[in-house]
Amino acid sequence: MDEFGVRNLRQAVASVGRDDLIQLCQELLRRPGVSGREGDVARFVAESMRSLGFDSVVIDSYGNVVGEIIFSAEGPRLLLTAQMDHVDAGDVAEWSKYPFGAFIEENRIYGRAASDQKGALASMMLAASLLKRDRSGALQGRLFVAGAVHQETFERVASKAIGDFADPDCVIVGEASGLLLERGQRGRAEIRVDIFGRMAHSSHPEFGVNAADVMVEFLSFLKSRFTPPRDEFLGEGILVLTNLFSSPSYN
């Protein structure tokens, strides 16, 4: 972008202001969006994108919202994406602040999904609208901003639909990074282990096989024998138990 384009962009940024970004973020936070129930958030995101001047806005069959700004028919395709969903807030009475209140205190916004990733989504939407105001002709290609669903539960399928639609040359994901540009991801493998015991009454455990005891032994064995790899650039791998389910029988 030449000097004229940079000057235009700075003027556009100055015209929006901090309050517009804060207000958009608060509106997102005030709309709960538990994974699989993101409809209210999605409708608001689509509405906002249209108001911000996106050239096209679609909500796909999964519920993802994808807005597009076209600078030219040819050129690179950039995708900015952040999730709209979050895990359940649980008992809201246990929170020190109402999780969907979007309160501001000491220059911080408090709310479920503020950093993961509604704050990023608000920033991306406004940033894209600012770029559209550039009239220098220096920007080429297409810019997509996507609000993704099911990130907490079904991300591989739902997010793939965004990628298939936008067909991007480059992607920026709104994961929290301490305002650092992170350019790699360790990847993830989900491993399910089923352990079957033999039922017995708790007063006579010697007649059965306690699957929970076997699971404890298995986890100890796994941690003692398997060390996650370390990459010079990406750092240490991790191994963590995330879910444990057992039979509903208590005796």
Model-derived regions: residue spans:
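A structural signal for short hydrophobic beta-strand segments in well-ordered beta-sheet cores
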Residues: 57, 67, 102-104, 241-244
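Acidic-enriched catalytic cores of C-N bond-cleaving enzymes acting on peptides and small amides
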Residues: 202-250
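Acidic/histidine-rich catalytic neighborhood of metal-dependent amide-processing enzymes
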Residues: 117-190
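Short glycine/serine- and small hydrophobic-enriched flexible loop segments
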Residues: 27, 126-133, 217-224
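Metal-dependent peptidase/peptidase-like ectodomains
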Residues: 169-170, 180-214
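Active-site metal-coordination/substrate-binding segment of hydrolases
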Residues: 76-144
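N-terminal helical capping/dimerization or prosegment-like subdomains
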Residues: 2-90
